[in-house]
């Protein structure tokens, strides 16, 4: 834990704090720290054939088995989960359940959800294409101009 997770969450915070119109489009597979990045913009979309993999924080390498290490993991997981639920419409309990699922990923914990399912559970605003994402972005820009 550290570099990738911390950097990804920091970038997601930057995107979510922008005042300029922002739209995301998940293509292929959104995985791991890609989930906070996907939900950070003002409007979020996912391609019909795309998927998202939701899983808890992972560690590899040498791990010191002390309570502090597990507390640190729990704090990072809480920060990520809070960001996701704060920038989408998914319920915290639903997100936690998807992260703890044991019947889907081989020898792992987590869930792979389809584009349509990501929308249905409130993780992503809607299913769309690049054209839809650009249309939304240009529409946001035009509405912003009209407000001035």
What are these regions (language model features)?
Residues 1-35, 39-148:
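N-terminal organellar transit peptides
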């Amino acid at each position: 834990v550290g570099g990738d997770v911390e950097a990804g969450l920091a970038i997601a915070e930057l995107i979510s704090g922008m005042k300029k119109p922002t739209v995301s489009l998940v293509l292929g597979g959104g995985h791991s720290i890609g989930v906070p990045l996907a939900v950070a913009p003002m409007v979020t979309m996912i391609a019909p054939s795309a998927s998202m993999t939701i899983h808890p924080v992972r560690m590899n390498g040498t791990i010191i088995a002390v309570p502090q290490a597990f507390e640190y993991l729990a704090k990072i997981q809480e920060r990520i989960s809070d960001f996701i639920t704060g920038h989408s419409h998914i319920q915290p309990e639903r997100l936690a359940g998807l992260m703890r699922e044991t019947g889907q990923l081989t020898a792992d914990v987590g869930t792979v959800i389809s584009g349509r399912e990501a929308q249905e559970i409130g993780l992503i605003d809607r299913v769309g294409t690049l054209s839809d994402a650009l249309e939304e972005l240009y529409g946001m820009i035009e509405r912003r101009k009209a407000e001035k």
